[in-house]
Amino acid sequence: MSNKILVVGAGFSGAVIARMLSEQGYLVDMIDKRDHIAGNAFDYHNAHNILVHQYGPHLFHTNNRSVFEFLSRFTEWVDYQHRVKAILEDGSLVTLPVNLETKDRVGEDKVIDTFIRPYSEKMWGLKLEEISPDIINRVPIRNDLNELYFPNDEFQAMPKAGYTALFEKMLQHPTIQVKLGTHFQKEMEADYAHVFNSMPIDEYYDYCLGPLPYRSLKFHHVDLPIPRIFPVCQVNFTNDGPYTRVVEWKNIPNSPQNPQYTSLTYEEPCSYTENNNERFYPVKDASGKNRELYLAYKAMENPKTTFIGRLGQYVYLDMHQVVSSSMAIAEKFLKENPL
C-alpha cells in the first residue's frame, strides 16, 4: 500500500491530520489555494506591530484536555478570558451574553430585538424565525452577573506567538511538504493512497445537486493614531448598519502593545457570491433543507476521499471542535490503515 497522502487545506483540520499521519510514517503533501498556512486562523503583525487576525477573532477555549495537550506541543499559551460588550443607540456599552445587568439596562422584553435579532439576521441573511435554533442558542441569556463569554471552559488561552507560529511548528516535520497558492485538481488524486479534503463538498462535485448556501464576511481593517478605544476586544453592534461587530486587537494579551496606535477590524456579513466565493459559515436553516442537500453530497463520497473541516463537512464548528474531530478522523484512519 502506498503511504502517500494528500491534504487539501492548511487550516486546523488539515494541519492536525497531516501532523498525526506524518508521525506514523505517512508522506503527506499539503496544498492550499491561499498564499499562507493556518487557514482562517492566520494572524500577522501589522505595520504598528499589533497582532491582527486576518479573518476575524479566533479565541481558543475548550474543556477537552486532549485537544489542549495536543496543541500545547506546538505553542506556549497566554491566559485570556474573553469578554464582549454591545454598543447601544446612546453609545453606552453593556455586557454580552445578556446577563441580569444587561437585562436591567434595556428591559427584558427588548432583549431579543436589541441583541439577538439584528446580529443574527445580518449574520445569516435570514429572518430570525428561519434560522436553526441551534445557532441562536449558541449565545445564551443568563440569569446571573457573570461577564465571561465562556464561563464554563477550563482551558482559555491564546497562542503566545500567535496562530501562524503554532501552525508553522505543527507542519514542521520531515514528511510534510506544503505547497501554497495551489488549487486542488481531481487529477491529483491518482497519485495518493488517500485524500483529506477541506474544500466545499458541493464545489468538489461541481454543484451537480445544486449549491449549498454559505455566508461570508468582509473584513475592514483600520489603524488609528490613538492608544485605545474600547475596554474589551470585541464590541457587537445593535443597529441596522452593515457591521455585526468590531474587534480591537491590542486588547488580546498576546499582541504587542503600541502606545501610539490601535488597530480594529469591522466585520460585514455577506453572501459568499458577493465576496470572491470566500465561504466562511454553512447556513443551518430551521427547515433542515440545507443539511439534507449536504447529506446527498456526502453519500457520493468515494472510499479514497474524506471531507474534513467546516466546508467539507458542512457544519459550524469552533476551533477546539475542529481539532477534536480531526484527531478522531486521523485516529480512525490510522487504525484502519496501519503501516
Give residue ranges: language-model regions.
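Short, well-ordered alpha-helix to beta-strand connector turns
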Residues: 3, 25, 174, 191-193, ...
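N-terminal Rossmann-like FAD-binding beta1-loop-alpha1 element of flavoenzymes
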Residues: 3-30
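Short N-terminal binding/cap micro-motifs at the start of the first secondary-structure element
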Residues: 14-15, 37-40, 316
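Short, well-ordered alpha-helices that flank and scaffold nucleotide-derived cofactor binding pockets
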Residues: 19, 23, 43, 172, ...
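Glycine-rich FAD pyrophosphate-binding loop
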Residues: 22-47
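C-terminal segments that line or cap access tunnels to active or ligand-binding sites in enzymes
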Residues: 192, 203-339
